[in-house]
Amino acid sequence: MAADIEAAKKAAAIEAVRNHFPENPRFVGIGSGTTIVYVVEAIKNSGIDVSRVGFVPTGYQSKQLIINAGLVPIEFDALPDSAMLDVAFDGADEVDEDLNCIKGGGACLYQEKLVAMRAKSFICVAARQVIQRLRMLGSRSPTGATPVIREGHMAKAGPIKTDQDFFIVDAPFPHPLLLSSDCTPERLGNGEHGYWEVEQLAKAIKEINGVLAVGLFCGPTGPEALAAQVIGGQRPVACYFGMADGTVALRRAREKRPSIVAKYPPLIPVRTTED
């Protein structure tokens, strides 16, 4: 089973790179997580000339992946002021039906958000299927809205910090997060009775003094933000999921259900759907 999952994650990465790595890119964002290891490997083995491409990491792990693959890293702060990333590849902890994501399990959420918002398009490669609604770290028992400083494990004493030396606070919520389409006059998604809509919650948390970034990636996609001539596209345009049965499921923004696009091995189209 574990081998099947790893094979599917690798296949998802290969499909994502094959379908979304642009011709002659200038800058490409590289996120973190187990699936992104395979994304970098797929880029390295693609045969594409990337000698003039700058790869922008979201954290220390990403930078090491880039360097170890023989690719050229460039720090986010070193980007020219007007430069956009042609594409950014990253993982996610949870993804809902509208491709809103929870990220930050690897403690890189601030840099991940900067990279996603600077990219023309954000492609998510994940190790699990889409869920109906974000559960806000639903592996924990809901405890209201009490924030908890994430504690280190055996390898690290004290609270977890980001690569920029900021504290990470996990805030479980009592109910799964609503989509905008779930909101009604009786359930506005503004926190009343513990029900939050994704974008309203992200905005409310961001307005708390001292909060630098929120691990909710929602709102417009990169193309939507560019079309509106605004900065801030952070929702992926597509998510590739490596499934336990060895298939790759693809979900695009605004798509009603995922398509099974590949099975590994070999990488061949199995079934697609049009909505």
Regions found by a protein language model. Give the residues of each.
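Conserved phosphate- and dinucleotide-binding cores of soluble alpha/beta proteins
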Residues: 3-7, 11, 61-275
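Short active-site oxyanion
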Residues: 25-28, 48-55, 100, 237
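Glycine-rich beta-strand-to-loop/alpha-helix junction loops that act as flexible
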Residues: 27-35, 39, 58
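Flexible, charged surface loops at secondary-structure boundaries
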Residues: 20-24, 49, 82-83, 117-118
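An N-terminal, well-structured beta->alpha segment
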Residues: 1-25
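Active-site histidine-anchored catalytic micro-motif
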Residues: 41, 45-53, 59-64, 68-69
